[in-house]
Amino acid sequence: MGKYQVMKRASEVDLSTVKYKAETMKAPHLTGLSFKLFVNLLEAPLIGSLIVDYLKKDNGMTKIFRNTVIPEEPMFRPEFPSQEPEHDVVIVGEDESPIDRLETALKCLPQYDPSRSLHADPVSSFRYWKIRDYAYAYRSKLTTPLQVAKRIISIIEEFGYDKPPTPFLIRFDANEVIKQAEASTRRFEQGNPISVLDGIFVTIKDDIDCLPHPTNGGTTWLHEDRSVEKDSAVVSKLRSCGAILLGKANMHELGMGTTGNNSNYGTTRNPHDPKRYTGGSSSGSAAIVAAGLCSAALGTDGGGSVRIPSALCGITGLKTTYGRTDMTGSLCEGGTVEIIGPLASSLEDAFLVYAAILGSSSADRYNLKPSPPCFPKLLSHNGSNAIGSLRLGKYTKWFNDVSSSDISDKCEDILKLLSNNHGCKVVEIVVPELEEMRAAHVISIGSPTLSSLTPYCEAGKNSKLSYDTRTSFAIFRSFSASDYIAAQCLRRRLMEYHLNIFKDVDVIVTPTTGMTAPVIPPDALKNGETNIQVTTDLMRFVLAANLLGFPAISVPVGYDKEGLPIGLQIMGRPWAEATVLGLAAAVEELAPVTKKPAIFYDILNTN
């Protein structure tokens, strides 16, 4: 008989006895021919199961799911108790139109001052153009949406000649973009723009439905089996505000990776260093924003897929509370860890896009009973209106578990500035069972994904998937029903730990990632790669927000010694997006000057 352990209930665990254990995931790093051979072995009937069982045992998953008694009941999706109202916020209605919510959001921002952007000294420092810069330029007749569209199209059409290629987009229709831009230009000529998003270019990740494009999820074949009949719920809201939908962004195939590697369409390069990954899976969304081609994009986040590429590309990425945005019309619809959220070149722009797309589905309103959406009051340029004296939870040993001290040092510098400038208090916390959380997340995201795609795989489409997706699926197939139930018992247990932490702090702060953008191995471009250590480093801090459904944001806080961006993650209580956004605004003001990426297009330069 094998040995087993019995966990105490979470309420009985003495946190003073918890010891931090650095993650050391074990698996070979493979690319090229060796990777192809490894995948073929994984999929072989007998030897494949032996390899998978060995990897799971060697990385502690067998012990967690087969040799542990977990006393908590399962929680199959995030469940939140009712929350205390956020302080000094503006409450908006779930049923308000996106246009009305945008008007409310604009009133929460500092008054627009063209001298700080469009009329600022162009050589003093680099800056990204914001949504309100475009809106002002259109209203002032400095340019038109059609002129901007033609400039963007000319750049996109040159992508195929870039060395190395920069495939930001999977689907792009120049005629469709021109059609939208002409309609927006007419509205401005008639003095009737719909909203501040009228004429603003937004890119949509390829797992979110957006007419007239098919949705492939980064595959080459999914459109053959899944047709797109209408816009997704979030895209419909953006379209109703006058946004110009640029196309479908590249992504790590089916969201099954954190680097952004995609051998089907080419791997998107990091605008700060084209030899490096963007992070994923919302790789194209992050890169096209970081490169200046559009102010914002939509991504999905099931395991850091908005926050990781945002951090690695030096932009802002918001992961909303589970259920805050309607997932209808996305490949993630029906999942228990995924959300749709904005990626933007500034906190302000992420806030505006969030204001447009928020709104729970009718099912989530009934089941989750979300608190009313709230906006922070960002009425000063230093964010002081929005944060007050927040308590910032920091688990120091975890916070410092990064590949380079540059990351923890830059994040620590910002925490000190928040304390000195805004009176925030850093509170030491303990986050138990991080290894168990990683294991529970793998099953919670992997099993539903595999289940939704199994009919296609059984029909022969598995061979059309990339090798890294096939690696993930081979592991997911090994999980049993009892493994899945055990993971959901861990979800309830981990929820109790975190809700108790939030009794003593307002947010939990960490670096967004445990490393900056990794180098792309040349052999990985054709057939992908498997590198569990890179995956572990990139996902180290992001999982609680997905497994437990909390809101979280990545905001840039500086650069490492190689000039690569570093992100700070702020994770809040359920439904507390206003707190997270308000603190992120203060961080943005305190962070060092933004560096111009190596790949950047100055779309709105009217000089």
UniProtKB/Swiss-Prot annotation:
GO terms for biological process: defense response to bacterium; lipid catabolic process; N-acylethanolamine metabolic process. It comes from the Eukaryota. InterPro entries: Amidase, Amidase_CS, Amidase_dom, AS_sf. It is found in: Endoplasmic reticulum membrane; Cell membrane. Changing residue 305 to A: Loss of activity. Substrate binds at residues 302-305. Inhibited by methyl arachidonyl fluorophosphonate (MAFP). Plants overexpressing FAAH exhibit accelerated seedling growth. Plants overexpressing FAAH exhibit enhanced susceptibility to the bacterial pathogen Pseudomons syringae pv tomato. Plants overexpressing FAAH exhibit enhanced sensitivity to abscisic acid (ABA). Plants overexpressing FAAH exhibit early flowering. Belongs to the amidase family. Forms homodimers. This is Fatty acid amide hydrolase. It comes from Arabidopsis thaliana. The lineage of its organism: Eukaryota, Viridiplantae, Streptophyta, Embryophyta, Tracheophyta.
